[in-house]
Each structure stands twice: as C-alpha cells, then as structure tokens.
Amino acid sequence: MKFALLSLAAMAVASPVAIDVRQTAITGDELRTGPCEPITFIFARGSTEPGLLGITTGPGVCNALKLSRPGQVACQGVGPAYIADLASNFLPQGTSQVAIDEAAGLFKLAASKCPDTKIVAGGYSQGAAVMHGAIRNLPSNVQNMIKGVVLFGDTRNKQDGGRIPNFPTDRTKIYCAFGDLVCDGTLIITPAHLSYGDDVPSATSFLLSKV
C-alpha cells in the first residue's frame, strides 16, 4: 500500500508545476564543472524527480539565491550515482549508502576545491534523508563550512528527532507541511507532501541570513 502511494505521489511530483523560477536552464552541476563562487548550494532532489536539482524546490531555491546574489552562487545537485529511486526510501537510512556517499563527496569537493566558499544545502523528501546521512558524518572542518541547510518534507524528521544528528540546529530549518505524514515517520504520501514550492522564498531567506 505504501509503495503504491509513493508511486502515485511520484507521478504527481513529476507533473509540470507553475512555470516560474522553477524551470530554467540550470544544469545543477556547477561545482563540478564551473569556477568557484562565494556561495555553493548543494541539493538532493526527491524520489523520481528529473535532473540533478529536481523540480519541486531545488531549482526554485537555486534561482532565488542567484537572483539575490548575482554572479556569486554555484548550484550543485546530488547525482548521477544518487538515482532518486522509490525503493531506496525503504532502506534503513531512508536512502542508499551510494547516495549518501556521493553527497558527502560533493561537500568535501566544495571544501577542497573552493576553500573560501560558504556552503548552503538542501534536500526534498528522500533528498532530505540523503542530507541527514551525508552531513552527520562529515569531518568537522567541512561541517563548519556549511552555513545553512533547508529540508522539505523530511523523511527522517521523526527518526532523527527533528534535526540532522551531529549538526547545529540553528543552521538547520526543516519544513514539514501540516498533514505531511512523511514527517511523522511514515512513507504515506498526501497532497501536503507536494506543497513545498510555497516554502522556497522562506527557505531562501533563511539560507541568505546565514551567509
């Protein structure tokens, strides 16, 4: 039953949403392939979402950061090793170890390639679990470079006590919409789980306040 609900939700997430800042020509691979910027945004998309940044919140936050700080932001999505498949939601960490390792590698790449950058990060749905798993075990010198993290529809919210373990709560903001049952430790998808595009302005403001 839960798997069927996840499948149904995945189709809804993959459907076109309002065409505004969410759908632009962003590759989401700017840390790997581009120059260092003062701010680096690392994001993990939700299950079945396309590209490296997905569609629900990743591109919106990326674009809003770029509009606020023109020429100062590099956006990097977690992938291609992280395939954002549905089945990985049922693993003990809420995602695959491969995905967690890839995300951790991107944080370490930002720290080594761009030692003066300020890192901000985010994740939606399964992508939030990716961020929990990656950030909690990073070396302290890399964690210290992460100034803010925003998580939407966090599938690890209840399991990890409303926070990313081993990471400061004042640098973390978790968005859990009223009625979104994944925030209560289930994988039951309700319409609320698809509403997080509305939180992009607030999330962007939070990240900007940290850099």
Swiss-Prot record:
SUPFAM superfamilies according to UniProt: alpha/beta-Hydrolases (SSF53474)
Gene Ontology cellular-component annotations: extracellular region
Residues of the signal peptide: 1-18
Keyword Signal: yes
Keywords carried by this UniProt record: Disulfide bond, Hydrolase, Secreted, Serine esterase, Signal
GO biological process terms, semicolon-separated: lipid catabolic process
Record-given protein name: Probable cutinase 1
Active-site residue numbers: 125 (nucleophile), 180, 193 (proton donor/acceptor)
Catalytic activity: cutin + H2O = cutin monomers
Main location class: secreted
Upper taxonomic lineage: Eukaryota, Fungi, Dikarya, Ascomycota, Pezizomycotina
Function: Catalyzes the hydrolysis of complex carboxylic polyesters found in the cell wall of plants. Degrades cutin, a macromolecule that forms the structure of the plant cuticle.
